[in-house]
């Protein structure tokens, strides 16, 4: 079962990715993790990636695709894999297809921008433990304080409204066109495209995923 997750930052992909990995026994492939692992291992591709990153440049699509191919050939991907955060653009999706990396399901988590902003800017984190709260959806017992230690909670830089809105603009410009791309791929019978209402509760989304993936 080879799956691509699509959806804006804050659409709930991370939570559901965890569920899919555990339920279906397939690993999540993150291009960031893959790049770090290749650099650390000092593989041929890792050396190339390191040279590009050290020069302050973005790693090319070709190199990322080569890393994905190398990664999915490993034993733990025998039953499939879950791609989140890649492909981000239509050229990357085309390159994946040309490299013979086929996908069974493309799952789009659809959530309106304003709800995403609401979800993200309300997050509060306890730095010591990583415990996450939300001022509206999961508030601490005492406002601004961690339930366990009573220490102050903080807002991550990434969770500030200006940053969130920037990331959403980037998503709509770069990644949203993939929705049309994979819709056409599904019509051609090359994959199954499923749009999931990400505004539902975590459990409802989970039930829908089980229904789709079997």
UniProtKB/Swiss-Prot annotation:
Residues 122-159 are annotated as: LID. Pathway: Purine metabolism; AMP biosynthesis via salvage pathway; AMP from ADP: step 1/1. Its EC number is 2.7.4.3. One of its GO terms (molecular function) is ATP binding. It holds the Pfam family ADK. Keywords: ATP-binding, Cytoplasm, Kinase, Nucleotide biosynthesis, Nucleotide-binding, Transferase. CDD domains: ADK. It is found in: Cytoplasm. GO terms for biological process: AMP salvage. AMP binds at residues 31, 36, 57-59, 85-88, 92, 156, 167. ATP binds at residues 10-15, 123, 132-133, 200. It catalyses: AMP + ATP = 2 ADP. It comes from the Bacteria. Residues 30-59 are annotated as: NMP. Disulfide bonds: none annotated. Consists of three domains, a large central CORE domain and two small peripheral domains, NMPbind and LID, which undergo movements during catalysis. The LID domain closes over the site of phosphoryl transfer upon ATP binding. Assembling and dissambling the active center during each catalytic cycle provides an effective means to prevent ATP hydrolysis. Belongs to the adenylate kinase family. Monomer. This is Adenylate kinase. It comes from Edwardsiella ictaluri (strain 93-146). The gene is adk.
């Amino acid at each position: 079962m080879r799956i691509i997750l699509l959806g804006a930052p804050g659409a709930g992909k991370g939570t559901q990715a965890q569920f899919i990995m555990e339920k279906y026994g397939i690993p999540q492939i993150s291009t960031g993790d893959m790049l770090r692992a290749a650099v650390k291992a000092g593989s041929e591709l890792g050396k190339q990636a390191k040279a590009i990153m050290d020069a302050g440049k973005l790693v090319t699509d070709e190199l990322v695709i080569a890393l994905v191919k190398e990664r999915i050939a490993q034993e733990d991907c025998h039953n499939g894999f879950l791609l989140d955060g890649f492909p981000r653009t239509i050229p990357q999706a085309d390159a994946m297809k040309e490299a013979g990396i086929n996908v069974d399901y493309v799952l789009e988590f659809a959530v309106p921008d304003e709800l995403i902003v609401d979800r993200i800017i309300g997050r509060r984190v306890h730095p010591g433990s990583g415990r996450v709260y939300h001022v509206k959806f999961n508030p601490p017992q005492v406002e601004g304080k961690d339930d366990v230690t009573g220490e102050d909670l903080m807002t991550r830089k990434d969770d500030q409204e200006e940053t969130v809105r920037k990331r959403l603009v980037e998503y709509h410009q770069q990644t949203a066109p993939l929705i049309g791309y994979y819709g056409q791929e599904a019509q051609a019978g090359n994959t199954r495209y499923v749009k999931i209402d990400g505004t539902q509760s975590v459990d409802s989304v989970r039930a829908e995923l089980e229904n789709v993936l079997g």
